Amino acid sequence: MQLVAALAALGALVAPAVAYPHAPMNETLVDVQLTAVGNTMVKATITNKGDSVLNMLKFNTIMDENPTRKVMVFQDGAEVPFTGMMPRYLMSDLTEEFFTTLAPQASVEHSFDIATTHDLSAGGKYVISASGAIPTAEEYSTTITSTALYESNELHMEIDGTQAAAVEQAMKFTPEMQSIHSRALQKRTKIVGGSCNQNTLRATQNALGNSARLAQAASRAASQNAAKFQEYFRTNDANAKQRVIARLNSVARESSSANGGSTTYYCSDTMGGCKPRVLAYTLPSRNLVVNCPIYYNLPPLTKQCHAQDQATTTLHEFTHNPAVASPHCQDYAYGYQQCISLPAAKAVQNADNYALFANGMFYSLFTIIF
Protein backbone atom coordinates (compact mmCIF):
# COMPACT_ATOMS: atom_id res chain seq x y z
CA MET A 1 0.00 0.00 0.00
CA GLN A 2 2.90 2.34 0.74
CA LEU A 3 4.24 1.78 -2.78
CA VAL A 4 0.84 2.46 -4.36
CA ALA A 5 0.46 5.60 -2.27
CA ALA A 6 3.90 6.79 -3.31
CA LEU A 7 3.17 6.24 -6.98
CA ALA A 8 -0.22 7.91 -6.72
CA ALA A 9 1.29 11.00 -5.16
CA LEU A 10 4.23 11.19 -7.51
CA GLY A 11 2.66 13.60 -9.97
CA ALA A 12 2.26 16.22 -7.26
CA LEU A 13 5.94 16.25 -6.29
CA VAL A 14 7.41 19.72 -6.77
CA ALA A 15 11.16 20.31 -6.91
CA PRO A 16 13.04 23.59 -6.60
CA ALA A 17 14.69 25.04 -9.69
CA VAL A 18 18.34 24.12 -9.29
CA ALA A 19 21.29 23.45 -11.57
CA TYR A 20 22.32 19.84 -12.23
CA PRO A 21 25.85 18.61 -12.93
CA HIS A 22 26.51 17.23 -16.40
CA ALA A 23 28.96 14.71 -17.68
CA PRO A 24 30.84 16.56 -20.41
CA MET A 25 29.38 16.03 -23.89
CA ASN A 26 32.14 16.54 -26.44
CA GLU A 27 31.07 17.03 -30.05
CA THR A 28 34.56 17.13 -31.57
CA LEU A 29 36.43 14.39 -29.73
CA VAL A 30 35.60 11.47 -32.04
CA ASP A 31 35.49 11.33 -35.84
CA VAL A 32 33.60 8.58 -37.68
CA GLN A 33 34.08 7.93 -41.39
CA LEU A 34 32.05 5.37 -43.34
CA THR A 35 33.31 3.59 -46.45
CA ALA A 36 31.84 0.80 -48.57
CA VAL A 37 33.85 -2.44 -48.59
CA GLY A 38 31.38 -4.69 -50.41
CA ASN A 39 27.86 -4.80 -51.80
CA THR A 40 26.32 -4.23 -48.36
CA MET A 41 29.43 -4.20 -46.16
CA VAL A 42 30.32 -0.92 -44.45
CA LYS A 43 33.54 -0.06 -42.64
CA ALA A 44 33.49 2.54 -39.89
CA THR A 45 36.79 4.19 -39.01
CA ILE A 46 36.66 5.75 -35.54
CA THR A 47 39.41 8.26 -34.71
CA ASN A 48 40.30 9.81 -31.37
CA LYS A 49 40.86 13.47 -32.25
CA GLY A 50 41.77 14.45 -28.70
CA ASP A 51 45.09 14.66 -26.90
CA SER A 52 44.44 11.97 -24.28
CA VAL A 53 43.65 8.25 -24.31
CA LEU A 54 39.97 7.35 -24.67
CA ASN A 55 38.39 4.21 -23.25
CA MET A 56 35.18 3.90 -25.27
CA LEU A 57 32.19 1.79 -24.25
CA LYS A 58 30.87 -0.14 -27.25
CA PHE A 59 27.25 -0.63 -26.15
CA ASN A 60 24.74 0.81 -28.66
CA THR A 61 27.41 2.62 -30.65
CA ILE A 62 28.91 2.19 -34.11
CA MET A 63 31.29 -0.34 -32.46
CA ASP A 64 28.62 -2.58 -30.92
CA GLU A 65 29.20 -6.22 -31.88
CA ASN A 66 25.50 -7.06 -31.60
CA PRO A 67 22.98 -6.39 -34.43
CA THR A 68 22.06 -2.96 -33.08
CA ARG A 69 21.18 0.19 -35.02
CA LYS A 70 24.59 1.46 -36.08
CA VAL A 71 23.56 3.47 -39.14
CA MET A 72 20.55 5.08 -40.77
CA VAL A 73 19.79 3.81 -44.27
CA PHE A 74 17.77 5.90 -46.71
CA GLN A 75 16.44 5.28 -50.22
CA ASP A 76 14.70 8.04 -52.17
CA GLY A 77 14.49 10.13 -49.01
CA ALA A 78 12.68 7.47 -46.97
CA GLU A 79 14.37 5.58 -44.15
CA VAL A 80 14.65 1.83 -44.65
CA PRO A 81 13.16 0.07 -41.58
CA PHE A 82 15.64 -1.36 -39.10
CA THR A 83 15.14 -5.10 -38.44
CA GLY A 84 17.76 -5.64 -35.75
CA MET A 85 17.56 -5.45 -31.97
CA MET A 86 17.42 -2.55 -29.53
CA PRO A 87 18.81 -3.86 -26.23
CA ARG A 88 19.01 -2.44 -22.75
CA TYR A 89 22.40 -3.29 -21.26
CA LEU A 90 23.29 -3.84 -17.62
CA MET A 91 25.39 -0.79 -16.80
CA SER A 92 26.73 -1.65 -13.35
CA ASP A 93 30.22 -3.08 -12.74
CA LEU A 94 31.40 -2.65 -16.33
CA THR A 95 34.56 -4.56 -17.28
CA GLU A 96 37.27 -3.74 -19.81
CA GLU A 97 36.11 -6.33 -22.36
CA PHE A 98 33.23 -4.01 -23.30
CA PHE A 99 35.55 -1.09 -24.08
CA THR A 100 37.86 -0.12 -26.93
CA THR A 101 40.94 1.91 -26.00
CA LEU A 102 42.22 4.54 -28.43
CA ALA A 103 45.41 6.57 -28.09
CA PRO A 104 45.36 10.23 -29.20
CA GLN A 105 44.96 10.51 -32.99
CA ALA A 106 44.71 6.71 -33.27
CA SER A 107 41.93 4.94 -35.17
CA VAL A 108 40.05 1.67 -34.97
CA GLU A 109 37.98 0.03 -37.70
CA HIS A 110 34.71 -1.84 -37.32
CA SER A 111 32.97 -3.49 -40.29
CA PHE A 112 29.38 -4.70 -40.46
CA ASP A 113 26.85 -5.84 -43.05
CA ILE A 114 23.86 -3.50 -43.21
CA ALA A 115 21.83 -6.20 -44.99
CA THR A 116 21.69 -8.20 -41.74
CA THR A 117 19.56 -5.48 -40.14
CA HIS A 118 17.78 -3.93 -43.15
CA ASP A 119 15.79 -5.31 -46.07
CA LEU A 120 17.75 -4.09 -49.09
CA SER A 121 16.28 -6.53 -51.60
CA ALA A 122 14.88 -3.65 -53.68
CA GLY A 123 18.42 -2.71 -54.63
CA GLY A 124 19.46 0.59 -56.13
CA LYS A 125 20.92 3.75 -54.62
CA TYR A 126 21.11 4.16 -50.85
CA VAL A 127 22.46 6.82 -48.50
CA ILE A 128 24.00 5.64 -45.22
CA SER A 129 25.01 7.76 -42.24
CA ALA A 130 25.67 7.34 -38.53
CA SER A 131 25.15 9.52 -35.49
CA GLY A 132 25.27 8.76 -31.82
CA ALA A 133 27.09 9.14 -28.55
CA ILE A 134 29.99 7.08 -27.23
CA PRO A 135 30.33 6.86 -23.42
CA THR A 136 34.00 7.30 -22.52
CA ALA A 137 36.18 6.57 -19.51
CA GLU A 138 39.72 7.56 -18.67
CA GLU A 139 42.66 5.29 -19.45
CA TYR A 140 42.71 2.11 -17.30
CA SER A 141 39.23 2.93 -15.99
CA THR A 142 35.74 1.66 -16.76
CA THR A 143 33.94 4.49 -14.95
CA ILE A 144 32.09 6.61 -17.50
CA THR A 145 33.13 10.24 -17.14
CA SER A 146 32.19 11.78 -20.49
CA THR A 147 30.36 11.20 -23.74
CA ALA A 148 31.54 11.87 -27.28
CA LEU A 149 28.90 12.76 -29.87
CA TYR A 150 29.60 11.75 -33.45
CA GLU A 151 28.15 12.50 -36.88
CA SER A 152 29.59 10.53 -39.78
CA ASN A 153 29.90 11.39 -43.43
CA GLU A 154 27.11 10.44 -45.85
CA LEU A 155 27.98 7.26 -47.70
CA HIS A 156 26.34 6.70 -51.10
CA MET A 157 26.08 3.05 -52.16
CA GLU A 158 24.72 1.28 -55.24
CA ILE A 159 23.42 -2.04 -53.92
CA ASP A 160 22.60 -5.23 -55.82
CA GLY A 161 19.22 -6.27 -54.43
CA THR A 162 19.59 -9.95 -55.30
CA GLN A 163 22.89 -10.21 -53.45
CA ALA A 164 21.47 -8.26 -50.51
CA ALA A 165 18.45 -10.58 -50.27
CA ALA A 166 20.79 -13.56 -49.94
CA VAL A 167 22.29 -12.15 -46.72
CA GLU A 168 20.80 -13.81 -43.65
CA GLN A 169 18.96 -11.51 -41.25
CA ALA A 170 20.62 -11.22 -37.84
CA MET A 171 17.40 -11.77 -35.88
CA LYS A 172 16.03 -15.05 -37.16
CA PHE A 173 12.27 -15.51 -37.06
CA THR A 174 11.50 -19.21 -37.56
CA PRO A 175 8.17 -20.43 -39.00
CA GLU A 176 7.22 -21.74 -35.54
CA MET A 177 7.92 -18.36 -33.96
CA GLN A 178 6.00 -16.61 -36.75
CA SER A 179 3.01 -18.82 -35.99
CA ILE A 180 3.23 -18.06 -32.25
CA HIS A 181 3.64 -14.35 -32.96
CA SER A 182 0.67 -14.29 -35.35
CA ARG A 183 -1.60 -16.10 -32.89
CA ALA A 184 -0.53 -13.73 -30.13
CA LEU A 185 -1.37 -10.70 -32.25
CA GLN A 186 -4.70 -12.14 -33.35
CA LYS A 187 -5.65 -12.70 -29.71
CA ARG A 188 -4.07 -9.41 -28.71
CA THR A 189 -2.00 -11.39 -26.20
CA LYS A 190 0.96 -9.53 -24.83
CA ILE A 191 2.82 -12.27 -22.96
CA VAL A 192 3.58 -15.43 -24.94
CA GLY A 193 2.84 -18.05 -22.29
CA GLY A 194 4.96 -20.74 -23.90
CA SER A 195 8.06 -18.63 -23.33
CA CYS A 196 7.49 -18.42 -19.56
CA ASN A 197 7.75 -20.61 -16.52
CA GLN A 198 5.82 -19.86 -13.35
CA ASN A 199 8.51 -17.61 -11.88
CA THR A 200 9.31 -15.62 -15.02
CA LEU A 201 5.62 -15.16 -15.82
CA ARG A 202 4.96 -13.79 -12.35
CA ALA A 203 7.97 -11.47 -12.55
CA THR A 204 6.98 -10.20 -16.00
CA GLN A 205 3.39 -9.57 -14.96
CA ASN A 206 4.60 -7.72 -11.86
CA ALA A 207 6.99 -5.63 -13.97
CA LEU A 208 4.18 -4.70 -16.33
CA GLY A 209 2.05 -3.51 -13.44
CA ASN A 210 4.88 -1.44 -11.98
CA SER A 211 5.75 -0.06 -15.42
CA ALA A 212 2.15 1.09 -15.87
CA ARG A 213 2.07 2.84 -12.50
CA LEU A 214 5.48 4.45 -12.99
CA ALA A 215 4.58 5.70 -16.47
CA GLN A 216 1.25 7.11 -15.29
CA ALA A 217 2.89 8.89 -12.38
CA ALA A 218 5.76 10.16 -14.54
CA SER A 219 3.23 11.54 -17.03
CA ARG A 220 1.59 13.54 -14.27
CA ALA A 221 4.97 14.74 -13.03
CA ALA A 222 5.92 15.83 -16.56
CA SER A 223 2.86 18.06 -16.78
CA GLN A 224 3.19 19.51 -13.27
CA ASN A 225 6.91 19.70 -12.52
CA ALA A 226 8.73 22.03 -14.91
CA ALA A 227 12.06 21.86 -13.05
CA LYS A 228 12.25 18.08 -13.18
CA PHE A 229 11.13 17.97 -16.80
CA GLN A 230 13.90 20.43 -17.68
CA GLU A 231 16.41 18.32 -15.76
CA TYR A 232 15.69 15.09 -17.61
CA PHE A 233 14.61 16.31 -21.05
CA ARG A 234 16.64 19.55 -21.35
CA THR A 235 13.67 21.68 -22.41
CA ASN A 236 10.29 22.97 -21.29
CA ASP A 237 9.02 23.49 -24.81
CA ALA A 238 5.27 22.84 -24.85
CA ASN A 239 5.37 20.60 -27.92
CA ALA A 240 8.22 18.50 -26.54
CA LYS A 241 6.39 18.16 -23.24
CA GLN A 242 3.24 16.96 -25.00
CA ARG A 243 5.25 14.34 -26.91
CA VAL A 244 6.81 13.05 -23.70
CA ILE A 245 3.48 12.97 -21.87
CA ALA A 246 1.78 11.19 -24.78
CA ARG A 247 4.55 8.60 -24.94
CA LEU A 248 4.41 7.94 -21.19
CA ASN A 249 0.63 7.57 -21.37
CA SER A 250 1.01 5.12 -24.25
CA VAL A 251 3.55 3.09 -22.27
CA ALA A 252 1.16 3.06 -19.31
CA ARG A 253 -1.67 1.73 -21.49
CA GLU A 254 0.56 -0.90 -23.07
CA SER A 255 1.80 -2.03 -19.66
CA SER A 256 -1.62 -2.10 -18.04
CA SER A 257 -2.78 -5.52 -19.20
CA ALA A 258 -1.09 -8.82 -19.99
CA ASN A 259 -3.96 -9.76 -22.30
CA GLY A 260 -4.38 -6.78 -24.57
CA GLY A 261 -2.00 -4.55 -26.39
CA SER A 262 0.00 -3.85 -29.50
CA THR A 263 3.23 -5.65 -28.56
CA THR A 264 4.18 -9.26 -28.04
CA TYR A 265 6.20 -10.02 -24.90
CA TYR A 266 8.47 -13.03 -24.38
CA CYS A 267 9.68 -14.10 -20.92
CA SER A 268 12.70 -15.83 -22.47
CA ASP A 269 14.95 -15.49 -25.50
CA THR A 270 13.78 -16.89 -28.82
CA MET A 271 16.19 -15.35 -31.32
CA GLY A 272 19.63 -15.40 -29.73
CA GLY A 273 19.64 -11.74 -28.75
CA CYS A 274 20.50 -12.30 -25.09
CA LYS A 275 24.20 -11.62 -25.43
CA PRO A 276 26.45 -10.71 -22.47
CA ARG A 277 25.03 -7.84 -20.37
CA VAL A 278 21.74 -7.65 -22.32
CA LEU A 279 18.83 -7.30 -19.87
CA ALA A 280 16.09 -7.25 -22.49
CA TYR A 281 15.70 -6.29 -26.12
CA THR A 282 13.11 -5.07 -28.59
CA LEU A 283 12.59 -5.78 -32.27
CA PRO A 284 10.88 -2.54 -33.33
CA SER A 285 10.14 -3.98 -36.77
CA ARG A 286 7.88 -6.57 -35.07
CA ASN A 287 6.80 -4.72 -31.90
CA LEU A 288 8.28 -7.57 -29.90
CA VAL A 289 10.00 -7.49 -26.49
CA VAL A 290 12.19 -10.24 -25.02
CA ASN A 291 13.43 -10.58 -21.45
CA CYS A 292 16.89 -12.09 -20.96
CA PRO A 293 18.00 -14.30 -18.04
CA ILE A 294 19.80 -11.49 -16.21
CA TYR A 295 16.61 -9.38 -16.31
CA TYR A 296 15.33 -11.58 -13.50
CA ASN A 297 18.39 -10.79 -11.35
CA LEU A 298 17.29 -7.16 -11.17
CA PRO A 299 15.07 -5.98 -8.31
CA PRO A 300 11.40 -5.65 -9.30
CA LEU A 301 11.43 -1.96 -8.34
CA THR A 302 14.63 -0.39 -7.07
CA LYS A 303 14.81 2.03 -4.18
CA GLN A 304 18.07 3.46 -5.55
CA CYS A 305 18.04 6.63 -7.60
CA HIS A 306 18.80 6.00 -11.28
CA ALA A 307 19.51 2.30 -10.73
CA GLN A 308 18.18 -0.33 -13.12
CA ASP A 309 15.28 -2.62 -12.24
CA GLN A 310 12.70 -4.83 -13.94
CA ALA A 311 9.98 -2.17 -14.06
CA THR A 312 12.01 0.57 -15.74
CA THR A 313 13.65 -1.96 -18.08
CA THR A 314 10.18 -2.93 -19.31
CA LEU A 315 9.25 0.75 -19.57
CA HIS A 316 12.49 1.44 -21.48
CA GLU A 317 11.79 -1.37 -23.96
CA PHE A 318 8.20 -0.29 -24.62
CA THR A 319 9.44 3.14 -25.76
CA HIS A 320 11.30 1.31 -28.55
CA ASN A 321 8.08 -0.09 -30.03
CA PRO A 322 6.46 1.99 -32.80
CA ALA A 323 3.06 0.44 -32.01
CA VAL A 324 3.28 2.03 -28.56
CA ALA A 325 4.38 5.46 -29.77
CA SER A 326 5.70 6.62 -33.12
CA PRO A 327 8.38 7.57 -33.81
CA HIS A 328 9.83 5.08 -31.36
CA CYS A 329 12.75 5.97 -29.10
CA GLN A 330 16.40 5.33 -29.91
CA ASP A 331 19.39 4.51 -27.69
CA TYR A 332 21.46 7.67 -27.93
CA ALA A 333 22.80 7.49 -24.37
CA TYR A 334 22.70 5.42 -21.20
CA GLY A 335 22.78 6.46 -17.56
CA TYR A 336 21.80 9.67 -15.81
CA GLN A 337 24.86 11.84 -16.48
CA GLN A 338 25.01 10.90 -20.14
CA CYS A 339 21.26 11.23 -20.73
CA ILE A 340 20.91 14.68 -19.17
CA SER A 341 23.83 15.84 -21.31
CA LEU A 342 22.00 15.08 -24.55
CA PRO A 343 20.58 18.01 -26.52
CA ALA A 344 16.82 18.34 -26.10
CA ALA A 345 15.98 16.93 -29.53
CA LYS A 346 17.77 13.69 -28.67
CA ALA A 347 16.72 13.59 -25.01
CA VAL A 348 13.01 13.44 -25.87
CA GLN A 349 13.73 10.56 -28.28
CA ASN A 350 16.07 8.59 -26.00
CA ALA A 351 14.63 5.53 -24.24
CA ASP A 352 16.75 5.78 -21.10
CA ASN A 353 15.64 9.35 -20.41
CA TYR A 354 12.12 8.00 -19.90
CA ALA A 355 13.25 5.15 -17.66
CA LEU A 356 15.45 7.48 -15.61
CA PHE A 357 12.74 10.13 -15.34
CA ALA A 358 10.21 7.58 -14.07
CA ASN A 359 12.74 6.17 -11.60
CA GLY A 360 13.94 9.58 -10.48
CA MET A 361 10.45 10.86 -9.83
CA PHE A 362 9.54 7.74 -7.83
CA TYR A 363 12.80 7.84 -5.86
CA SER A 364 12.39 11.53 -5.00
CA LEU A 365 8.96 10.89 -3.52
CA PHE A 366 10.02 7.60 -1.91
CA THR A 367 12.79 9.32 0.07
CA ILE A 368 10.38 12.06 1.21
CA ILE A 369 7.67 9.63 2.36
CA PHE A 370 9.88 6.92 3.80
Curated annotation (Swiss-Prot):
Q: Where does the sequence pass through the membrane?
A: none
* Active-site residue list: 317
Propeptide segments, given as residue ranges: 20-188
Could you give the cofactor binding note from the entry?
A: Binds 1 zinc ion per subunit.
EC class, as a word, reads: hydrolase
SUPFAM superfamilies assigned: Metalloproteases ('zincins'), catalytic domain (SSF55486)
What the entry lists under Gene3D superfamilies is as follows: 2.60.40.2970, Collagenase (Catalytic Domain) (3.40.390.10)
Q: Which reaction does it catalyse?
A: Preferential cleavage of bonds with hydrophobic residues in P1'. Also 3-Asn-|-Gln-4 and 8-Gly-|-Ser-9 bonds in insulin B chain
Under which name does UniProt file this protein? Probable neutral protease 2 homolog ARB_03949
GO molecular function terms attached to this record = metal ion binding; metalloendopeptidase activity
Which keywords does this chain's UniProt record carry? Cleavage on pair of basic residues, Disulfide bond, Hydrolase, Metal-binding, Metalloprotease, Protease, Secreted, Signal, Virulence, Zinc, Zymogen
User: What's the family?
Assistant: Belongs to the peptidase M35 family.
Q: List S-S links within the chain.
A: 196-267, 274-292
Where found? Secreted
EC number of this enzyme: 3.4.24.39
User: What is the top-level taxon of the source organism?
Assistant: Eukaryota
InterPro entries, per this entry? Answer: Fungal_M35_metalloproteases, MetalloPept_cat_dom_sf, Peptidase_M35
Instruction: Name the residues that bind Zn(2+).
Output: 316, 320, 331
Q: Name one GO cellular component term.
A: extracellular region
